[in-house]
Amino acid sequence: AMSTIIYPSPVFGPVHSRRLGVSLGINLLPEDGKFCTFDCVYCECGFNKDHRPHRPLPTREEVYTVLEERLKDMHENGPHPDVLTFAGNGEPTLHPEFAGIIEDVVRLRNHYFPEAKISVLSNATQVLKPEVFNALLKVDNNIQKLDTVNPDYIELVDRPTGHYDVQQIIDQLKAFSGHVIIQTMFMTGSTQGKSVDNTTPEFVEPWLKVVQEIKPRQVMIYTIDRETPDHDLRKAGKEVLDRIGEQVREAGFEVSVSY
């Protein structure tokens, strides 16, 4: 049995994190399964095939109502959230009402906790949709995944479920004009007998070149930390992550490294 995580929907937490402070989670995906355009071998929610959802996506109205209730309660009784984070069982930007939900959340945040930030954790597959792109410009932390720029590695590790053209995605990430945080998972080990080590210069150098083209506000480097559905994956070591982080810093970008 895998100890993978399925998040309640549409609001969960708050979770206290060293990096983010008090984070209230918003899960726009079904609470009984996983809904994603990637099927990453390292996903803490498990493989798509093992978690097919049967419940519907929460509606925009439902998200608004539940979130307002929680924010009202936190306003009266604490704790005050530092950040409202769109995360959960898959890809939040897949929700057909994503843009409207972002508008609502911005409005609720401004009313109850104007100092709180809004973060979206995304795999970047939907940034080509204008309504998603424009909605992401309205959030404080637009966090987009780019594990590598190598198409074969993406097929092996991120396993897109539909058409995925990394160059198209990169061009669209550049179009954020710096209003984007790039998040990259580094690891070693293997999957299906093939190496997944993307910490070598062969992977890091082209990735860093693309980071310099995208010009993000920040780069988040991390490695696997919870149980993964594929047991042959290994964490990238602290020294390795620090070395990559240093290269990003030398290139002129703010960087956060999580071990």
Give a label for each model feature.
Residues L94-R234:
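Conserved AdoMet/S-adenosylmethionine-binding subsite of the radical SAM
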Residues I6-Y7, H51, F86-N89, H163-A175:
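Generic detector of contiguous secondary-structure segments
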Residues A1-V41, G46-P58, E69, D73-P79:
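N-terminal [4Fe-4S]-dependent radical SAM core
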Residues A1-R19, T65, K72, T188-Y259:
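Auxiliary Fe-S-binding modules of radical SAM enzymes
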Residues L28, F86-G88, T184, T223:
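Short glycine-centered, acidic/aromatic-flanked micro-motifs in structured strand/loop junctions
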Residues S23-G25, V83, I143, I181:
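Short hydrophobic-acidic sequence motifs that mark active-site Asp/Glu residues
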Residues Y42-K138:
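Conserved Radical SAM active-site core
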